[in-house]
A protein has these predicted regions:
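Structural recognition of the beta-strand scaffold that forms the well-ordered cores
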Residues: 13-15, 25-29, 68-71, 100-106, ...
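Acidic/histidine-rich catalytic neighborhood of metal-dependent amide-processing enzymes
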Residues: 6-8, 34-127, 161
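Acidic, Ser/Thr-rich low-complexity intrinsically disordered segments
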Residues: 217-269
């Protein structure tokens, strides 16, 4: 618990201890507050449910590295990116501990409003360490979701990964982006895709387990992830765009920039 600007806030944190306390822990986190008094099924109850599910699974496995699970308060306006924001306060309180990697979830319960890409999950932040790109390549998402890794700068600091980015902690940010019910009273449970939520939970468990054993040697944002991004655009996006009668050619960073702008237009970004 903490106080800020005369208000009380509460982060909820648990840890599965590892065998080697000298190793920096990994962090799995999501905010649990909602915008205004809206239901917040997608924003952000779905992510909270995934964190709790993965925590239950990881609690039964012995590993060298500790795993911290954090549910953050005060992510939504008017606290967003302020000193009241739960993830910022959490990092400030724990900065001497250090973190091997942070995995942050937000808006992970809905289908993308793009025909043929409803099952897509964006994974941002692999550019922060070469080892994260290797983990993404080595951990298939499974048959129920498709993953599209991309740069964080295309969406900006829209969630709790912000404090880890500015402090040069390797991170991955998992999200399905915004949709028509974002920050609306219509963000209700019956609109969620529970099969997709379950698939994202399995994927998070896989990449968290892999990252816990992966050396992340840096430097922070010290490599070019263009080739990985192109591989996923070619395998995931090309077939769908061709079926829509809108074939595209994406071959370099300039093309990826164009593609990202196009996708943000589809998603209302």
């Amino acid at each position: 618990s903490y106080e800020s600007a005369g208000e009380s806030y509460h982060n909820i944190v648990a840890m599965v201890p590892g065998r080697d306390p000298s190793l920096e822990p990994i962090l799995l986190g999501a905010h649990y507050d909602t915008c205004d008094s809206f239901p917040g099924a997608d924003d952000n109850a779905a992510a909270v449910a995934i964190i709790l599910d993965v925590a239950a699974e990881m609690a039964h496995v012995s590993r060298d590295r500790s795993v911290v699970f954090a549910l953050f308060d005060a992510e939504e306006p008017p606290n967003f990116l302020s000193q009241s924001m739960g993830s910022i306060r959490f990092y400030q309180d724990q900065r001497l501990t250090g973190f091997h990697c942070a995995l942050i979830l937000d808006l992970v319960g809905h289908d993308l409003p793009v025909p043929g890409l409803e099952d897509l999950l964006f994974v941002m932040g692999m550019e922060t360490d070469y080892g994260l790109g290797e983990v993404i390549k080595d951990c298939p998402a499974g048959p129920s979701i498709r993953v599209l890794p991309t740069l964080s700068r295309y969406v900006g600091d829209m969630s709790d990964h912000h404090v880890f980015r500015v402090n040069h902690v390797p991170y991955l940010f998992l999200s399905c982006g915004t949709w028509e019910h974002y920050h609306q009273p219509t963000d209700t449970p019956e609109k969620l895709n529970y099969g997709k939520i379950e698939a994202i939970s399995r994927y998070l468990l896989a990449i968290a387990s892999a990252i816990s054993m992966k050396q992340l040697s840096g430097p922070f944002e010290g490599y070019d992830s263009t080739d990985i991004e192109l591989d996923y655009i070619h395998s995931v996006i090309y077939p769908v765009m061709a079926q829509m009668g809108r074939p595209i050619r994406v071959n370099d960073r300039r093309d990826i920039d164009w593609f990202a702008d196009m996708m943000m237009g589809y998603l209302g970004g």
